[in-house]
Curated annotation (Swiss-Prot):
Region annotation N-(5'-phosphoribosyl)anthranilate isomerase: where it falls in the sequence: 535-770
Gene that this polypeptide is encoded by: trpC
Reaction catalysis annotation: N-(5-phospho-beta-D-ribosyl)anthranilate = 1-(2-carboxyphenylamino)-1-deoxy-D-ribulose 5-phosphate; 1-(2-carboxyphenylamino)-1-deoxy-D-ribulose 5-phosphate + H(+) = (1S,2R)-1-C-(indol-3-yl)glycerol 3-phosphate + CO2 + H2O; chorismate + L-glutamine = anthranilate + pyruvate + L-glutamate + H(+)
Protein name: Multifunctional tryptophan biosynthesis protein
Binding site for L-glutamine: G76, P77, G78, Q108, S154, L155
CDD domains linked to this entry: GATase1_Anthranilate_Synthase, IGPS, PRAI
Positions of transmembrane segments: none
Entry's Gene Ontology cellular component terms: cytosol
UniProt xrefs under PROSITE patterns: GATASE_TYPE_1, IGPS
Annotated Pfam families: GATase, IGPS, PRAI
Sequence ranges assigned to domain Glutamine amidotransferase type-1 in this UniProt record: 25-225
Length: 770
């Protein structure tokens, strides 16, 4: 090899330092790079005891359990956010606890973990030796102000995104005569966390072994704990700092940039956690575990108001601070849905907006079983397919894509990925240039943010100014700053189809009234159907005569007991004629349903309200078969054989059976049992004591407590009811009595152990008077 002026700085005949008791358990994370073992060699030569683990072969929990004295992150190929395995999560956890040193990709992981960005430098280097200028602190303590280092990289941290908590400790100049430099070292200002982009373990790097020696002297997780005071440059070190300091290092980032950087770091860490890795999410999606979804654009076109409402769950914001810290996201969602919202926007950003993906998951669960439920939007700073897949698995129907924060290439990629999961995104714009990008993209729904995300200033005229750029088929939504009816008047005239409201809704004393006033409706627009007398169920029916008398009196449900050994159990040869009577006997004309006051189709109806309606047949009574702890196959067989319209489960059957039985299910609950108000399983819960049929009255105060726990709960009340007490018991419940949508009687209409037709008629008449 010709003499090139290169100097071999490797320890040809190394002298191993004495064993360091303070570096007795150094953990070295191997990012699948051959240089890892050069790093290992230098650490061992300096007296450290080192254990090496590949980045995908140890979990964070296992790493924590090993109680390392220092942590070193090795070089490696690829990008720190996708190829560093456990590295970023380890940095996040151990920062401030133990000293951390990163080499090459290890430094890049440090930068991204604290909110910075890594990007191409314009150079692709492999074994390039460059002159380094440094600040003489940390790893560089005691070294000459300029020294030769060896570089193997094409990526590096970017000056404009280095967060305030980090300082640039060294740099090299680009070789293109641009007088610009590349970040070669960063250091946390308070925590004992330092990184280098070059390779101190290379044989062509000067003083590499001393750099590792300086690191191994550290024993505490902070500089102060190690007797160092970094973060401010002293007069003695200023001369060694690069002569052309990066002009953007101290640039104040916009709120959007700060949030974006923080989310990038957080998502990078999350993607390394077992059970939350991209492959884990994809596996769950491939198992069809994502909740059912609805088409976002179609739901936006349905509203009981002149404009559709996108109602937002928002605990805080960067501009207003804390808004509703203690808000319960699922409870808020139900209020919005019943008030006529077409979409519920759930902010899932945790630091500035105090939301989470768990909020979205809970919101989706809270709307389960509602008719025409609102679509669910994940309001988040999305920059990765991972976040879109995570949203779909949590139950989102759409996601937000912000044009301002995405390159056209990335925006296009994310848009099409979201659509591949069945979610048409909401594409957010703020300027004419951004609107053109969204229109060219083919977005079906475009949201115009009246708030400039750089300055966070609000201009309600922003939406109006951009309307002429939008095709007529595109749904335009006005976002941000809307607080009252005057704010939306112009939008109605200009073709805006929807508005998003967050803070004003979260602060509203009466959500439904505020929404109606805001959108020009009335409190009656989304009110449920008018009050009806409760459903009447006559149980323990044992003859055709009793069934016919009950129906002609106006009963809605005729129950027959299918439980062998129970009083009143009827065999099949008795049950079949009763079934025929139920199907052939019409209800009295006075019991015909009136539908004129039912809620508009565009609204969402609570699950139990819908279920109660299903159990109220317009022209005849329904036959209910009562079962108790019997095999599912037997229940299904009897349902088909007898033509049961409804199945009642009166024992300890699994809740999930309600979804396996092809007709509505009434399920008996005691007052202390859980899941009484669980939606989308049993059609209605029946409150009763013991096994039923005992004639024992339920404790009124306890019934009231059960009803008051959930405003959407509807029940059938049983237990000791008879013609003389049923009206008084329901009336005594006061306003909570409106949640009693059915009453059930068995022994209360019997005399001497047999059904009494006069008592049946009297019971029905007493209920109809409510």
């Amino acid at each position: 090899m010709a003499d090139s002026g290169l100097v071999d700085h490797s320890p040809h005949h190394p002298t191993k330092a004495a064993q360091l008791s303070t570096a007795s358990n150094v953990i070295l994370i191997d990012n699948y790079d051959s240089f890892t073992w050069n790093v290992y060699q230098y650490l061992v030569l300096e007296g450290a005891t080192v254990n090496v683990f590949r980045n995908d072969q140890i979990t964070l929990e296992e790493l924590i359990a090993k109680k390392p004295t220092q942590l070193v992150i090795s070089p490696g190929p690829g990008h720190p956010e996708t190829d560093a395995g456990i590295s970023s999560a380890a940095i996040q956890y151990f920062s401030g606890k133990i000293p951390i040193f990163g080499v090459c990709m290890g430094q890049q992981c440090i930068i991204t973990c604290f909110g910075g960005k890594v990007d191409v430098t314009g150079e692709i280097l492999h074994g390039k030796t460059s002159p380094l200028k440094h600040d003489g602190k940390g790893a560089y303590e005691g070294l000459p102000g300029s020294l030769a280092v060896t570089r193997y990289h094409s990526l590096a941290g970017t000056h404009a995104t280095i967060p305030d908590c980090l300082e640039v400790s060294s740099s090299v100049q680009l070789a293109d005569d641009s007088n610009k430099d590349v970040i070669m070292g960063v250091r946390h200002k308070k925590l004992a966390v330092e990184g280098v982009q070059f390779h101190p373990e290379s044989i062509l790097t000067e003083y590499g072994r001393i750099m590792f020696r300086n690191f191994l002297k550290l024993t505490a997780g902070t500089w102060e704990g190690n007797g160092k005071h970094f973060g401010e440059q002293s007069s003695t070190t200023k001369a060694t700092v690069p002569s052309n300091p990066p002009p953007k290092t101290d640039k104040k980032l916009s709120i959007l940039e700060r949030i974006y950087d923080h989310r990038r770091a957080a998502v990078a860490v999350q993607k390394t956690i077992p059970s939350q890795r991209p492959a884990d999410l994809q596996a769950a999606y491939d198992l069809n575990l994502a909740p059912p979804q609805i088409p976002f654009p179609a739901r936006l076109r349905q509203s009981p108001y002149p404009l559709s409402l996108m109602a937002e769950i928002k605990r805080a914001s960067p501009s207003k601070g804390m808004i509703a810290e203690n808000a319960c996201a699922p409870a808020q969602a139900r209020q919005y849905a019943k008030a006529g919202a077409s979409v519920i926007s759930v902010l899932t950003e945790p630091e500035w907006f105090k939301g989470s993906i768990d909020d979205l998951r809970a919101v989706r669960q809270s709307l389960e079983g509602m008719t025409n439920r609102p679509a669910i939007l994940r309001k988040e700073f999305v920059f990765d397919e991972y976040q879109i897949l995570e949203a779909r698995l949590a139950g989102a129907d759409t996601v937000l894509l912000i044009v301002k924060m995405l390159s056209v290439e990335l925006l296009t990629r994310l848009y099409h990925y979201s659509r591949s999961l069945g979610m048409e995104p909401l594409v957010e714009v703020n300027t004419p240039e951004e609107m053109k990008i969204a229109v060219d993209l083919g977005a079906e729904v475009i949201g115009v943010n009246n708030r400039d995300l750089t300055s966070f200033e609000v201009d309600l005229g922003t939406t109006s100014r951009l309307m002429d750029q939008v095709p007529s088929s595109t749904i335009v939504c006005a976002l941000s700053g809307i607080s009252g009816p005057k704010d939306v008047e112009a939008y109605k005239k200009e073709g805006v189809k929807a508005i998003l409201v967050g803070e004003a809704l979260m602060r509203a004393a009466d959500t439904a009234t505020f929404i109606a006033e805001l959108l020009g409706g009335s409190s009656q627009t989304v009110s449920s159907e008018s009050r009806r007398s409760p459903l009447v169920k006559i149980c323990g029916t044992r003859s055709e005569e009793a069934a016919r008398a009950a129906i002609e009196a106006g009963a809605d449900l005729i129950g027959i007991i299918m439980v062998q050994g129970r009083t009143g159990c009827v065999p099949d040869d008795v049950a079949l004629p009763i079934s025929q009577v139920v199907r052939s006997t019409p209800k009295p004309a006075s019991q015909a349903l009136h539908t004129s006051q039912e809620p508009p189709a565009a609204t969402s109806v609570e699950y139990f309200d819908h279920s109660a309606k299903i159990l109220r047949h317009p022209s005849r009574a329904l036959l209910v078969g009562v079962f108790q702890n019997q095999p599912l196959d037997y229940i299904l067989s009897q349902q088909q054989k007898l033509g049961l319209d409804v199945v009642q489960l009166h024992g300890s059957e699994p809740l999930e059976w309600a979804k396996l039985i092809p007709v509505p299910v009434i399920r008996k609950f005691g007052l202390d049992e859980p899941a009484i108000a669980r939606r989308a399983y049993h059609s209605l819960p029946l409150l009763d004591s013991g096994v039923g049929g005992t004639g024992e009255l339920l404790d009124q105060s306890r019934v009231q407590n059960v009803l008051d726990k959930d405003c959407g709960l509807r029940v059938i009340l049983a237990g000791g009811l008879d013609p003389t007490n049923v009206a008084g018991i329901v009336q005594k419940l006061g306003e909570s009595g409106r949640k009693v949508v059915g009453v059930d009687v068995s022994s209360g209409v019997e005399s001497d152990g047999a059904q009494d037709l006069n008592k049946i008629r009297a019971f029905v008449q007493a209920v109809r008077g409510l």
